Amino acid sequence: MNASGSAPLGANSEVGQLRAVLLHRPGDELKRLTPRNNDQLLFDGLPWVDRAQEEHDAFADLLRSRGVEVLLLSDLLAETLGASGAARIQGIGAAVDPRKLGHTLAQELAAHLRGVPAPELSTILTAGMTFDELPVAANTASLVRRMHHGGDFVIDPLPNLLFTRDSSFWIGPRVAITSLALPARVRETSLTDIIYAHHPRFRGARRAYESHTAPVEGGDVLLLAPGVVAVGVGERTTPAGAEALARSVFEDELAHTVLVVPIAQARASMHLDTVCTMVDHDAVVMYPIIQDTLSAFTIHREDNGVSIRGADPFLSAAAEAMGIGKLRVIDTGLDNVTAEREQWDDGNNTLALAPGVVVAYERNVETNARLEASGIEVLRIAGSELGSGRGGPRCMSCPVARDPL
């Protein structure tokens, strides 16, 4: 613990004892989802929001019961906006887009938001705003206002904030602000950036990787062991993003090896953590259908730059980089059909609370049984509604403090 009684910030693995985590309790942004926009906003269905909140509250309570400090993004955001004028300006600037709204409406909306109380502004920045909710009169001299339907968004909602893993991650004692690939999620990083830059809890936190234009998402980043990072490249993270991240962590001496792992560009495997996560210091839960074909390019830091080797089989490349003989692999599901079903339902997307202790969705019965048969303690949570955005316990959590391995 530091002088404030909080755990020191940072993480050097996926499985070190979890001390503090950033979550986002689902809110009004999920109520913005409709059959017309859910695909654009990256949800497969329309969640029952009250039940999603109940499921998330149970998830947070489970973490607290295991001694984990739970930080809620909306609370941190409201506190930051209330304490920092610079944070308020930054948040409004990211949300109000003159290219979409035109100069007149953008100016009037920004002026209005500057006077909104911090808790209300926090809600607007996360849940968005429609034209019907504008304080600006309908007959204002704005063609944009007159031509839009009242239910159209002036500020888009951010339903994927639920998945706090993607917009930032900690590596060593530093935090990386990522660059999200799809338009529906781009603005999320502005909110995490505001919190890490201006909230007192994170005062002095140094950056590992500033948000580059080449996409990198936290769900594609696994801290396999101290100094060893795996980065998935597929639907979200690009080769350019992975290379930029590798060079950044090498320059800051946060890693000596980065494994770049190509994955299928498909909804079911949008991130590396949808097909593989760490459950112990030497064990992963992995989708068996890709086990024999998953490969990795190994990037090493060298005195005069970097070296790139491969592609080699992922499991052997990872074990070599981690300095262990072999990774234990626990398969998803029971057979090919069950494996495919449970992978789709985030059976691979576990959150480790300590070596050999993970949180998983209860619905993935066969995968959870396999984990327990391999000596892993499985803490089950409901996820019938939370899973509609295609994310599990790991996706919904950003560890900000883990004990080092």
UniProtKB/Swiss-Prot annotation:
Substrates-to-products reaction catalysed: L-arginine + H2O = L-citrulline + NH4(+)
E.C. numbers: 3.5.3.6
Record flagged with keyword Cell wall biogenesis/degradation: no
Localisation: Cytoplasm
Pfam families: ADI (PF02274)
Residues at the active site: C395
Keywords: Arginine metabolism, Cytoplasm, Hydrolase
Keyword ATP-binding: no
One GO term (biological process): arginine deiminase pathway
PANTHER family the record matches: ARGININE DEIMINASE
Name this protein carries in UniProt: Arginine deiminase
Gene source species: Rhodococcus opacus (strain B4)
Protein encoded by which gene: arcA
